[in-house]
Structure formats: C-alpha cells, structure tokens
C-alpha cells in the first residue's frame, strides 16, 4: 500500500525562495510542480495545502508628500491555483504596517531631501501559521495521512509539528536546494527531504 501524505506549503516562504532562485513565484503550474516534487515515488498525495494571504487593497498617505497612494491587489493567480487537482488554499490576511526607509538612504546624507520613492510599503502576513497548526491538528485527529511534507521556515509551526508526531504522524521537512532550514525545525522533524527546483 502506498503511503498517503499531505503536502503543506507555506506560500510566503515558498514564493520568497522562488524569487531568490529566479523561479516564477506566482505561477500556479509551477507551484503545483513544487508540490508534487515534495513526495517520493512510494507516496500518494492525499491533499496539497497552500497557505498564503491575498494582496493588500486600500489607501495610505505617503510619508513625505502626504499624498494618497492606492494599493490594488491582483489575486488572479490564487484563483487559478485553487482549481488545481487535490489543492486547497488557506488564506491569512495581509496587513499594511506603514512605510519603511530604503536601506540605501541610511545613513541619511544632509542636503539630500527624502522623497516618497525613498520609502517602501511594509506588509505583514497574519494568521497563516495558525491555519497551518489547525489543519495539522485535524490531520492528526482523523489520521487521514501518514506523513506531512512541510515546506516552511516558521518556527511558530513547531507546536503543531510536535503534536502531529505525538499522534503518530511523521513530519518530512522540505528543504529546497541552496537554502538551509531553521535548526529548530529540524529538531522536530522525522525526515529532512531535500528537493531540487522543478524544471
């Protein structure tokens, strides 16, 4: 009998690594390829869980001019991703935290006035680790899978990982080529699963 697994992808983490590796971060077909690369030939995917937040839509006053800046989210790629086989999307919320001075302007040079372009918007993803934890607890309770293949670098997931292992499930931490996971995560993992970027 093949081993049933749930592939659990922290979207913010996966997209960040895609950008650093010159891979398409919001291509539904490529994300699907990544998910399938997380299983071994002896395993069958029960479900693919993709956790992310939609884009931010709203307005904010720019830090220098005081003019209003409009933010418009484009979440078409998430809708397309949701139609993929076996894939379920869990969305957190993206919060706007203000504008941050570009490090290139630090330290500030007198005589060079700052402009709005010297600042970039700062966003924070909320609720994703909580949703990962809830779903891992549900998988532990109903025992619908034997292995959770987890792609994240968020140490807030450790309590859920510990609970799943105590319940008899195995955790395979997905390690992408060229990137090192947090040591704390490895301490609560059954397997370190190294994968190459799909072509």
Descriptions of predicted regions:
Residues 90-199:
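Nuclease catalytic cores that cleave nucleic-acid phosphodiester bonds
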Residues 1-107, 116-121, 170, 176:
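Domain-level signal for Mg2+-assisted phosphodiester chemistry and nucleotide/NA-binding surfaces
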